[in-house]
């Protein structure tokens, strides 16, 4: 019986992995690598650009970004999603399942 449970678990994990990979296949990704910059911070370089000078350098939180479009897209996504983030806007007390319920007295 335990082998049957293990097989079902393996199938479930495989199905989850396939679903995850299918989702990731549809995402347009930009490859970046981290290198040391002269200023002591980290520098993100687009893999296809090499190490030459880039006119479109953008400073983001002490990082020199060689992919300003990618950084702008990420910043846009974060600001759009911020209104739905429970860590930023909080959870309404009526829907918070972790909030302690008010005690009541049994008569």
From Swiss-Prot:
Keyword Cell membrane belongs to the record: yes
UniProt record, GO biological process: G protein-coupled receptor signaling pathway
Residue spans crossing the bilayer: none
Domain G protein gamma: 69-107
CDD domains reported in the protein's UniProt record: GGL
Keyword S-adenosyl-L-methionine found: no
Compartments reported by the entry: Cell membrane
Keywords, in A-Z order: Cell membrane, Membrane, Transducer
InterPro entries per the UniProt record, alphabetical: G-protein_gamma-like_dom (IPR015898), GGL_sf (IPR036284), Gprotein-gamma (IPR001770)
Entry-linked SMART domains: G_gamma, GGL
UniProt superkingdom: Eukaryota
Gene Ontology cellular component list: heterotrimeric G-protein complex
GO molecular function: G-protein beta-subunit binding
Subunit field text: G proteins are composed of 3 units; alpha, beta and gamma.
The protein's role, per its UniProt record: Guanine nucleotide-binding proteins (G proteins) are involved as a modulator or transducer in various transmembrane signaling systems. The beta and gamma chains are required for the GTPase activity, for replacement of GDP by GTP, and for G protein-effector interaction.
Recorded family membership: Belongs to the G protein gamma family.
Name of the molecule in the record: Guanine nucleotide-binding protein G(I)/G(S)/G(O) subunit gamma-14
Source species: Homo sapiens (Human)
Recorded name of the encoding gene: GNG14
